[in-house]
Amino acid sequence: MKRVLLLLLTLSLLALRADEPVSKLNGAFRQVKNKFGTMTDWKPRDSVTVIKVFRDGYWLGAYYNDKRKGRRWFDGACGGTYALKNGKYEETVGYYSWDSTAVGKAYSFDYAISPKQYEQYGKMTSDKYKDYPINEVCDRITAAEPLKNNALEGVWFMQEGYWGGTSRFGEGNYKDFQVVKIFSYPMVVYAYYNPKTRQFDGAGGAMYQFDGKTLTETNEFWSWQPDGSRKGNVESFKMTLENGRFVQEGWSGKLREVYAKAN
Protein backbone atom coordinates (compact mmCIF):
# COMPACT_ATOMS: atom_id res chain seq x y z
CA MET A 1 0.00 0.00 0.00
CA LYS A 2 2.86 2.36 0.84
CA ARG A 3 4.44 1.66 -2.54
CA VAL A 4 1.18 2.46 -4.31
CA LEU A 5 0.83 5.73 -2.41
CA LEU A 6 4.45 6.63 -3.16
CA LEU A 7 3.92 5.88 -6.85
CA LEU A 8 0.78 8.01 -6.95
CA LEU A 9 2.61 10.86 -5.24
CA THR A 10 5.51 10.61 -7.69
CA LEU A 11 3.16 10.61 -10.67
CA SER A 12 1.32 13.61 -9.27
CA LEU A 13 4.56 15.55 -8.87
CA LEU A 14 5.65 14.65 -12.40
CA ALA A 15 2.30 15.74 -13.79
CA LEU A 16 2.59 19.03 -11.92
CA ARG A 17 6.07 19.58 -13.34
CA ALA A 18 5.00 18.46 -16.81
CA ASP A 19 2.48 21.22 -17.43
CA GLU A 20 2.99 24.28 -15.26
CA PRO A 21 1.10 27.59 -15.43
CA VAL A 22 2.64 30.10 -17.83
CA SER A 23 2.27 32.77 -15.14
CA LYS A 24 5.23 31.13 -13.38
CA LEU A 25 7.55 33.20 -15.61
CA ASN A 26 5.69 36.52 -15.37
CA GLY A 27 8.15 39.38 -15.05
CA ALA A 28 10.90 41.31 -16.82
CA PHE A 29 14.52 40.15 -16.93
CA ARG A 30 17.88 41.55 -18.02
CA GLN A 31 20.56 39.21 -19.37
CA VAL A 32 23.75 39.19 -17.28
CA LYS A 33 25.74 36.46 -19.04
CA ASN A 34 25.45 34.24 -22.09
CA LYS A 35 27.04 31.46 -24.10
CA PHE A 36 25.80 31.64 -27.69
CA GLY A 37 26.84 29.85 -30.87
CA THR A 38 30.43 28.61 -30.86
CA MET A 39 31.35 30.31 -27.57
CA THR A 40 33.07 27.88 -25.19
CA ASP A 41 32.97 30.08 -22.10
CA TRP A 42 30.30 32.20 -20.48
CA LYS A 43 30.59 35.91 -21.28
CA PRO A 44 29.24 38.81 -19.21
CA ARG A 45 26.59 40.76 -21.11
CA ASP A 46 28.07 44.23 -20.55
CA SER A 47 28.23 45.76 -24.04
CA VAL A 48 24.51 45.68 -24.88
CA THR A 49 21.30 45.61 -22.86
CA VAL A 50 19.27 42.45 -23.50
CA ILE A 51 15.84 42.10 -21.92
CA LYS A 52 13.20 39.39 -21.99
CA VAL A 53 9.67 40.03 -20.75
CA PHE A 54 7.12 37.31 -19.97
CA ARG A 55 3.42 37.61 -19.28
CA ASP A 56 0.66 35.01 -19.37
CA GLY A 57 2.03 32.94 -22.25
CA TYR A 58 3.55 35.77 -24.32
CA TRP A 59 7.18 36.92 -24.47
CA LEU A 60 9.26 39.69 -26.02
CA GLY A 61 13.03 40.08 -26.17
CA ALA A 62 15.05 43.12 -27.26
CA TYR A 63 18.68 44.18 -27.74
CA TYR A 64 19.45 47.88 -27.27
CA ASN A 65 22.00 50.37 -25.91
CA ASP A 66 24.47 48.47 -28.07
CA LYS A 67 28.08 49.61 -27.63
CA ARG A 68 29.59 46.95 -29.89
CA LYS A 69 31.59 48.24 -32.85
CA GLY A 70 29.58 48.58 -36.04
CA ARG A 71 26.22 47.97 -34.35
CA ARG A 72 23.21 50.26 -34.16
CA TRP A 73 22.04 51.42 -30.72
CA PHE A 74 18.86 49.38 -31.21
CA ASP A 75 19.96 45.98 -32.50
CA GLY A 76 16.66 44.09 -32.79
CA ALA A 77 13.70 42.39 -31.15
CA CYS A 78 11.79 39.12 -31.17
CA GLY A 79 8.78 37.59 -29.48
CA GLY A 80 5.84 35.24 -29.59
CA THR A 81 4.10 32.79 -27.28
CA TYR A 82 5.31 30.21 -24.77
CA ALA A 83 4.20 27.25 -22.67
CA LEU A 84 5.74 25.21 -19.85
CA LYS A 85 5.39 21.53 -20.72
CA ASN A 86 7.18 18.34 -19.75
CA GLY A 87 9.58 20.33 -17.61
CA LYS A 88 10.63 22.47 -20.58
CA TYR A 89 10.16 26.06 -21.67
CA GLU A 90 8.62 25.90 -25.15
CA GLU A 91 8.48 29.09 -27.20
CA THR A 92 6.93 29.79 -30.59
CA VAL A 93 8.34 32.71 -32.58
CA GLY A 94 5.81 35.26 -33.83
CA TYR A 95 8.32 37.91 -34.98
CA TYR A 96 12.12 37.96 -35.26
CA SER A 97 13.89 41.02 -36.63
CA TRP A 98 17.20 39.27 -37.42
CA ASP A 99 15.82 36.43 -39.56
CA SER A 100 12.20 36.13 -40.69
CA THR A 101 12.64 32.40 -41.37
CA ALA A 102 12.55 31.84 -37.60
CA VAL A 103 8.92 33.04 -37.51
CA GLY A 104 6.50 30.21 -36.88
CA LYS A 105 9.13 27.87 -35.51
CA ALA A 106 8.89 26.35 -32.02
CA TYR A 107 11.87 25.67 -29.76
CA SER A 108 12.21 23.73 -26.52
CA PHE A 109 14.63 24.85 -23.78
CA ASP A 110 15.67 23.73 -20.34
CA TYR A 111 14.95 26.52 -17.91
CA ALA A 112 15.12 27.60 -14.28
CA ILE A 113 13.19 30.36 -12.56
CA SER A 114 13.60 31.94 -9.13
CA PRO A 115 12.54 35.20 -7.49
CA LYS A 116 15.82 36.72 -8.67
CA GLN A 117 16.79 35.00 -11.95
CA TYR A 118 15.67 33.29 -15.15
CA GLU A 119 17.93 30.80 -16.94
CA GLN A 120 17.48 29.26 -20.39
CA TYR A 121 19.51 26.54 -22.15
CA GLY A 122 18.97 25.06 -25.61
CA LYS A 123 19.20 25.61 -29.37
CA MET A 124 17.32 27.35 -32.16
CA THR A 125 17.50 26.85 -35.90
CA SER A 126 16.58 29.02 -38.89
CA ASP A 127 18.09 29.84 -42.27
CA LYS A 128 20.56 32.23 -40.62
CA TYR A 129 21.08 30.40 -37.32
CA LYS A 130 21.64 26.68 -37.94
CA ASP A 131 21.42 24.50 -34.83
CA TYR A 132 22.47 27.57 -32.82
CA PRO A 133 23.11 27.18 -29.06
CA ILE A 134 21.39 29.77 -26.86
CA ASN A 135 22.33 29.73 -23.18
CA GLU A 136 21.58 32.71 -20.99
CA VAL A 137 21.23 33.82 -17.39
CA CYS A 138 19.07 36.85 -16.61
CA ASP A 139 18.44 38.89 -13.46
CA ARG A 140 14.90 39.94 -12.63
CA ILE A 141 14.26 43.67 -13.14
CA THR A 142 12.84 45.08 -9.93
CA ALA A 143 10.65 48.14 -9.52
CA ALA A 144 11.65 51.28 -7.67
CA GLU A 145 8.13 51.53 -6.21
CA PRO A 146 4.98 49.37 -6.03
CA LEU A 147 2.54 49.41 -8.94
CA LYS A 148 -0.31 51.72 -7.97
CA ASN A 149 -2.98 50.06 -10.13
CA ASN A 150 -2.61 46.67 -11.83
CA ALA A 151 -5.52 46.96 -14.29
CA LEU A 152 -3.15 47.06 -17.29
CA GLU A 153 -1.13 44.00 -16.29
CA GLY A 154 -1.44 41.38 -19.01
CA VAL A 155 -1.29 41.06 -22.79
CA TRP A 156 -3.23 43.27 -25.19
CA PHE A 157 -3.73 43.44 -28.97
CA MET A 158 -4.41 46.64 -30.89
CA GLN A 159 -7.86 47.00 -32.44
CA GLU A 160 -7.61 50.61 -33.64
CA GLY A 161 -4.65 52.95 -34.02
CA TYR A 162 -4.17 56.56 -35.12
CA TRP A 163 -0.93 58.53 -34.82
CA GLY A 164 -1.66 61.75 -36.72
CA GLY A 165 -1.39 62.31 -40.45
CA THR A 166 -2.71 59.50 -42.64
CA SER A 167 -1.35 56.49 -40.72
CA ARG A 168 -4.01 54.07 -39.51
CA PHE A 169 -3.73 50.63 -37.98
CA GLY A 170 -5.03 48.01 -40.43
CA GLU A 171 -4.62 50.26 -43.47
CA GLY A 172 -1.82 51.12 -45.92
CA ASN A 173 1.57 50.18 -44.52
CA TYR A 174 -0.14 48.61 -41.50
CA LYS A 175 -2.60 46.40 -43.39
CA ASP A 176 -2.64 42.84 -41.95
CA PHE A 177 -0.41 43.93 -39.06
CA GLN A 178 -0.67 42.84 -35.45
CA VAL A 179 0.43 44.99 -32.53
CA VAL A 180 0.95 43.30 -29.19
CA LYS A 181 1.48 45.22 -25.95
CA ILE A 182 2.68 43.42 -22.83
CA PHE A 183 2.45 44.95 -19.36
CA SER A 184 4.60 42.99 -16.91
CA TYR A 185 5.55 45.40 -14.15
CA PRO A 186 7.88 47.24 -14.05
CA MET A 187 8.10 47.07 -17.87
CA VAL A 188 5.73 47.58 -20.77
CA VAL A 189 6.89 46.35 -24.19
CA TYR A 190 5.21 46.26 -27.59
CA ALA A 191 5.87 45.11 -31.16
CA TYR A 192 4.45 45.80 -34.63
CA TYR A 193 4.63 42.89 -37.09
CA ASN A 194 2.87 41.23 -40.02
CA PRO A 195 2.20 37.52 -39.34
CA LYS A 196 1.29 36.87 -43.00
CA THR A 197 4.54 38.19 -44.50
CA ARG A 198 6.69 37.64 -41.36
CA GLN A 199 7.70 41.32 -41.61
CA PHE A 200 8.91 43.00 -38.43
CA ASP A 201 8.19 46.74 -38.30
CA GLY A 202 9.42 47.83 -34.89
CA ALA A 203 9.27 47.57 -31.12
CA GLY A 204 9.38 49.74 -28.03
CA GLY A 205 9.74 49.36 -24.31
CA ALA A 206 9.57 51.43 -21.15
CA MET A 207 9.42 51.34 -17.39
CA TYR A 208 5.87 52.16 -16.44
CA GLN A 209 3.56 53.27 -13.66
CA PHE A 210 -0.25 53.41 -13.70
CA ASP A 211 -2.57 55.09 -11.20
CA GLY A 212 -5.87 54.02 -12.73
CA LYS A 213 -6.19 57.00 -15.07
CA THR A 214 -2.73 58.01 -16.28
CA LEU A 215 -0.06 55.75 -17.77
CA THR A 216 3.47 57.09 -17.27
CA GLU A 217 6.23 55.57 -19.40
CA THR A 218 9.98 56.16 -19.03
CA ASN A 219 11.42 55.05 -22.35
CA GLU A 220 13.99 52.26 -22.55
CA PHE A 221 14.04 51.72 -26.33
CA TRP A 222 12.07 52.76 -29.42
CA SER A 223 13.19 51.17 -32.68
CA TRP A 224 11.72 53.93 -34.86
CA GLN A 225 14.50 56.17 -33.49
CA PRO A 226 17.28 53.54 -33.45
CA ASP A 227 19.97 55.98 -32.28
CA GLY A 228 18.70 55.81 -28.69
CA SER A 229 17.82 59.51 -28.49
CA ARG A 230 14.42 58.66 -27.04
CA LYS A 231 15.78 56.71 -24.05
CA GLY A 232 14.88 58.32 -20.74
CA ASN A 233 12.00 60.36 -22.15
CA VAL A 234 9.00 60.43 -19.82
CA GLU A 235 5.56 60.43 -21.44
CA SER A 236 2.07 60.41 -19.93
CA PHE A 237 -1.06 59.02 -21.56
CA LYS A 238 -4.73 59.23 -20.68
CA MET A 239 -6.13 55.72 -20.20
CA THR A 240 -9.77 54.62 -20.28
CA LEU A 241 -10.57 50.99 -19.39
CA GLU A 242 -13.89 49.28 -19.97
CA ASN A 243 -15.11 45.73 -20.73
CA GLY A 244 -11.70 44.17 -21.40
CA ARG A 245 -10.48 47.04 -23.56
CA PHE A 246 -8.48 50.20 -23.04
CA VAL A 247 -8.13 53.43 -24.97
CA GLN A 248 -4.75 55.18 -24.83
CA GLU A 249 -4.55 58.85 -25.84
CA GLY A 250 -1.58 61.20 -25.96
CA TRP A 251 0.93 63.13 -28.07
CA SER A 252 -1.24 66.27 -27.82
CA GLY A 253 -4.18 64.51 -29.44
CA LYS A 254 -2.20 62.86 -32.26
CA LEU A 255 -2.18 59.37 -30.71
CA ARG A 256 -5.25 57.27 -30.06
CA GLU A 257 -5.01 53.49 -29.69
CA VAL A 258 -7.62 50.92 -28.70
CA TYR A 259 -6.56 47.54 -27.32
CA ALA A 260 -8.44 44.38 -26.36
CA LYS A 261 -7.09 41.93 -23.80
CA ALA A 262 -5.72 38.63 -25.11
CA ASN A 263 -7.64 35.43 -24.33
Features from the language model and the residues they span:
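A surface-exposed loop-and-adjacent beta-strand signature within N-terminal beta-sandwich domains
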Residues: 84, 88-90
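A generic structural signal for ordered secondary structure
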Residues: 6, 79-81
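Bacterial Sec-dependent N-terminal signal peptides
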Residues: 1-24
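Lipid interaction determinants
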Residues: 18-77, 90-203, 211, 216-263
